[in-house]
Amino acid sequence: ELLRHGTNLLLTDPRRMGKTFWMRNFASQEAGFRCYFIDYEGVFTVHNFLINTADALIKERKLPERALTKLKTIFDNCDLEISPGPITLKTYHHQTSPHVLLTNVLTALDDDEDDAIPVVMMDEVPMAINNIADREGASAAEEVLQTLRALRQKTARVRWIVTGSVGFHHTLKKTNMTQGVLNDLESLRFGPLSNEEAKELAHRLLLGVGQDPNEAIIDK
């Protein structure tokens, strides 16, 4: 209901597991939303952040035609069936600020005229911001968070969910940023997983490591 009414969410629960599971579960079950899950684990530069964003949107294979057309003006290899290789920035955009391009990529979702509400699910953002600060400096990291905040203010239809296994407070302190870059997000704490959620998570984890997810093991 929060998302339907225009609230953007910051998943702040301290537990390391469950937030990503919740987002993927939400995306698969909730009608009326078109969800785009973006994982920023392993991102160390603003350019990486941009590429990860665009790549995830394209691979979802449910981008509205207008948004995909916009991405094709920025990147090569956007047609997965024709160009299976990684997307790359077009030559004439090599000198364009990646923060500007990030804005162009994500605002394209706001042009969707479908009834479904677009939801951008950004996972492991604190880790990426921390890595960018280490690699490119605190100002580059801060500009990413400022860009994302401006996007949340600018877009009318898009909803945003931001989370990560590393707390934002450590990242903000390290880069001398204030909570102001996040204060437009509503903090949502999960608390413990329900019994059914815990079983479903255990089931998926066992499948992920090639184990038989039988009930006896899961119940333990």
Set out the residue ranges of the language-model regions.
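Pre-Walker A adenine-sensing motif
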Residues: 1-3
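P-loop NTPase nucleotide-binding core
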Residues: 5-135, 158
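C-terminal alpha-helical "lid" subdomain
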Residues: 103, 115-119, 210-211, 215, ...
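Alpha-helical scaffold elements adjacent to nucleotide-binding pockets in ATP/GTP-utilizing enzyme cores
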Residues: 22-26, 48-56, 143, 147, ...
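Sensor-1/coupling segment of RecA-like P-loop NTPase cores
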Residues: 118, 127-128, 137-176
